[in-house]
A protein has these predicted regions:
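Short, polar loop motifs at secondary-structure junctions
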Residues: 113-117
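Short, glycine/polar-rich helix-capping loops at beta-to-alpha or helix-loop-helix junctions
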Residues: 136-140
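Surface-exposed amphipathic alpha-helical tracts and adjacent flexible/coil segments at the periphery
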Residues: 2-39, 44-47, 51-54, 68-69, ...
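Residues at the C-termini of beta-strands that transition into short coil/loop
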Residues: 131
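Short active-site loop/helix that positions an aromatic residue
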Residues: 118-123
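Aromatic- and glycine-enriched glycan-recognition loops and surfaces
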Residues: 57-66
Length: 667
């Protein structure tokens, strides 16, 4: 019988020492997607907990998160839980309890927006500043770092020089979005959803007003653009800028998408894993932030899962083509053209082969008309006949040679429904001992080492060469574990015969012991102490744009020197016209109406207001040319002012429950 004698230690010689560890941070709607993100190469995953997670329909139970944590930690990967909504006073106590529960599950960090959380009695969990904190300046970044944030998510609108300046001024880890949907407004500075519907983006319930069609009018009422999706951005794609972002100081590379499905997360995670690995391999000063190597069983493509077109936004310079004005939907890639439309089928000429189940579409008068190919039949070279599941009536409106797109590649998607990746941690194996006892040492790539012994009587083998090969091969069989054998050394006094069944059991027990040792040696971060002397907030007056929604947040800002604090927009104290969006995206620039482009004298710049119209909704656009920003001006609707404040106890009571509290009428 095997004796259990596990010893683990960190061996410095086996640990890659680097001050530049790169973290690939993937989104997860649920625990199943989180596991696949890790298997496809994520160094960390961010996921919503049971509440306050800034995504209305992406919450997960404490049980699911508690089961996810050890899975991640076996790969050295981290779990960050989002608690990045602004909180009403009635929610502070439940939030405090939730944070304590999350800490007990072993999660690595909380991503937060509300500064009131820092005033609560919570465990010493590591804190990350959400993108909702609107971190655009060196002063704000340094302040957040100094009050206890270990990692800060910078605004998507920053350029390389701005990122570099923040990195040089603070010791916080710099996190930056590299892929996914773009909010047109600065994150945390969008109130249009609450103004129009009562659904607060700062509380995870955005109504997506930015994806609606608008008509743009100038100050004379003339139409500049009719019924276009003028606030809808293309999707972020920083593939080409990864090296430059590393040089600017980014260490955590974040993929957007806690609403995205599993195929999307698998694909985009795999894409950036391969991109970052190539950079790490090329440069000697970089390392990945977690353990293992990842093998993908498909070819990742950012163009084959949901996207609205690609832009690198403002990382290099302002560009005119950042908007997805024609449609906020995923139209996919061009694959050819429609040649003829019949009653129940269409003939197409294509540049790529089609398959049964493909999703195809055409754009007709700004509307995407899509259909699923039930059956396709090749009729000639690059020619197909397609029978849709259901023939859209609008297809008969198009003329020959109308462009055809594919937004679902059925064969490619099928690969993602199966096992599409494998991730294994390297282990060095050494077998020593003597005829009465075998000693097996396993050392993981992080340097965690265990020894396992097996007592018995192991005689010299008749065929020494065969016995040695059997021992090496048997010890390297780690297929049912998360490990792979990087090196196998046999240091025995001779070629001993060990029955395969005994060797297999010996190896399995050692691998289990290594699992336990690696989990025991895992070190999660903790709350960063406040700097001494205490920092001072860079402003003394905070407007509603600071999103202060509870007394604890007020106490926080007062503690650090703020004197006057206006209530958050959700408090319904801003009843007049205010900026309901502040954006770096500028419609004057997009339509070549920017005064800076036309004139060189700053004193003569004059950008008159414009209007955005959607049905009965009229929004005023004002332009602040010095910082190059557009302000979307609107007013909260009267019926919303009469609603209970979001997050309050009253707001959580349903109408039926409220009726039950009314006194019953007598006879």
């Amino acid at each position: 019988m095997a004796k259990i004698a596990a010893i683990f230690q960190l061996l410095d010689k086996n640990v890659t020492v680097s001050s530049h560890r790169l973290e690939l941070l993937s989104p997860a709607r649920d625990a199943a997607i989180a596991r696949e993100a890790i298997l496809h190469g994520a160094d960390a995953v961010y996921i919503g907990g049971p509440g306050f997670g800034a995504r209305h329909n992406a919450s997960n139970s404490l049980k699911d998160i508690a089961e996810l944590v050890p899975f991640a930690h076996r790969y050295g990967a981290k779990i960050f839980v989002t608690l990045n909504t602004i909180l009403h006073d009635d929610e502070l106590e439940p939030a405090q309890r939730l944070i304590t529960d999350l800490y007990q599950t072993g999660v690595d960090a909380l991503i937060v927006q509300d500064m009131g959380i820092l005033e609560l009695d919570i465990p010493p969990i590591e804190l990350h500043a959400s993108t909702q904190c609107d971190i655009r300046t060196v002063e704000k970044a340094k302040f957040l770092s100094d009050v206890g944030f270990t990692q800060i998510v910078l605004a998507r609108e920053l350029n390389l020089d701005q990122i570099r300046a923040i990195h040089q001024a603070t010791d916080a880890t710099i996190e930056f979005f590299i892929h996914g949907a773009l909010c047109v407004a600065y994150s945390g500075q969008c109130y249009i959803s609450h103004a129009q519907t009562g659904r607060s983006a700062n509380r995870g319930d955005c109504s997506q007003a930015c994806r609606l069609p608008y008509t743009l009018k100038d100050d004379q009422g003339r139409v500049v653009s009719y019924e276009k999706h003028l606030l809808s951005m293309k999707d972020n794609d920083q593939t080409a800028n990864l090296g430059a972002l590393i040089d600017a100081g980014v260490r955590s590379f974040k993929i957007e998408g806690r609403y995205k499905d599993m195929s999307y997360v698998k694909n985009i995670t795999a894409h950036y894993r391969q991109m970052l690995d190539a950079i790490i391999e090329e440069r000697g000063d970089l390392a990945r932030a977690s353990s293992g190597r990842t093998e993908h069983f498909f070819v990742p493509s950012t163009e084959k899962t949901f996207h609205r077109g690609s832009t690198d936004y403002f990382v290099n310079a302002r560009k005119g083509d950042i908007g997805a004005f024609d449609s906020p939907k995923f139209i996919g890639l061009p694959v050819g053209e429609v040649v003829k439309v019949a009653k129940d089928h269409l003939d197409v000429a294509v540049t790529e082969p089609l398959a049964n189940g493909d999703g195809l579409n055409v754009l007709i008068k700004r509307e995407v008309v899509g259909f699923r190919a039930n059956t396709v039949e090749k009729t000639g070279e690059n020619q197909y006949r397609v029978w849709p599941n259901e023939m859209p009536a609008d297809l008969h409106k198009i003329r020959p040679h109308h462009p055809l797109n594919r937004n679902l590649d059925h064969n490619w998607q099928q690969a993602l429904t199966k096992t599409s990746s494998e991730r294994r941690v390297a282990v060095d194996i050494e077998l020593g001992g003597w005829q009465e006892q075998l000693i097996l040492t396993l050392t993981s790539e992080e340097g965690v080492s265990i020894t396992h012994t097996l007592d018995g009587q192991f005689d010299e083998a008749n065929n020494a060469e065969k016995a040695m090969n059997n021992l090496k091969d048997g010890l390297a069989k780690l297929g049912q574990t998360l490990y792979y054998a990087r090196d196998v050394q046999i240091n025995l006094p001779g070629a001993l015969f060990v029955p395969n069944s005994l060797l297999n059991q010996f190896r399995r027990e050692a691998a289990d012991k290594l699992d336990a040792a690696r989990l025991a040696s895992y070190q999660r971060g903790s709350r960063k102490p406040v700097a001494d002397p205490a920092p001072v907030y860079p402003q003394t007056h905070l407007s509603f744009l600071a999103n202060v929604y509870n007394q604890k947040a007020r106490e926080f800002y007062h503690r650090y020197g703020v004197q006057l604090i206006d209530a958050a927009y959700e408090a319904h104290e801003e009843k007049g016209e205010v900026p309901v969006m502040i954006t770096k995206h500028c419609l004057r620039f997009a339509f070549n109406l920017c005064p800076k482009q036309a004139k060189g004298n700053i004193k003569s710049w004059k950008a008159t207001p414009m209007q955005l119209v959607n049905g009965d909704e009229v929004l005023t656009l004002k332009f602040d040319c010095r910082p190059c920003e557009m302000h979307v001006i609107g007013k909260i609707k009267n019926h919303i002012l009469k609603m209970p404040l979001p997050g309050s106890v009253v707001a959580s009571v349903s109408p039926d429950e409220l009726l039950k509290t009314l006194p019953k009428r007598k006879g």
